[in-house]
Amino acid sequence: MTISFANKVAIVTGAGGGLGRAHALYLAKLGAKVVVNDLGGALDGSGGNSEAAEKVVAEIKAAGGTAIANGASVSDDAGVAHLVKQTMDAFGRIDVLIANAGILRDKSFGKMELKDFEAVVNVHLMGTVKPAKAVWEIMKAQGYGRIVVTTSSTGLYGNFGQTNYGAAKMSLIGFMSSLKLEGAK
């Protein structure tokens, strides 16, 4: 069986490196037009520009694929609106959203500031919810759409110094478990 994403458009968040980059490259290899989203900051979410996303786009284009870069924050309403508008303006549809963006601010809970807890939950959870909400009606109107979320065993089993990350990742499991039921209707 041959898998093809020809004529499909995929947004991959957090695609400037790691799993997101791998997802973007593979989807492009299978024929998808890919929107490579990455804020390009440090692992803790500080700093950033679209350079990381642009490098992945260059890799995709060098291999004969089609891609555009987006450096917006997926935890920001205006950033998500720009991401979706840029995708629709460039390609006219959105078939796949891979919500992979994330940051780390590891510290034991007793030493962690609430702002660091909130920042991680905001990027992982709301940085998934906001893009999913933004593409939901587009996908429904098309009669096709797939939303894939990156989670972690830390959400189920925990990991020292990652209460924020574990809470965010477990919440994604609940979010997707409910969303898949709604999407099936």
PLM regions and their residue ranges:
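A glycine-rich helix->loop->beta "capping" turn
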Residues: 63-66, 86-99, 105, 144
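Active-site loop immediately N-terminal to the catalytic Tyr-X3-Lys motif
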Residues: 110, 157-164
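Canonical Rossmann dinucleotide-binding motif of NAD(H)/NADP(H)-dependent dehydrogenases/reductases
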Residues: 3-36
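Substrate-binding pocket helix/loop in short-chain dehydrogenase/reductase
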Residues: 60, 108-109, 113-121
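Residue(s) in the substrate-gating loop at a strand-loop-helix junction
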Residues: 152
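A short, exposed helix-loop element centered on a Lys and neighboring polar residues
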Residues: 132-133, 177
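Active-site helix of classical SDR
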Residues: 20, 132, 168
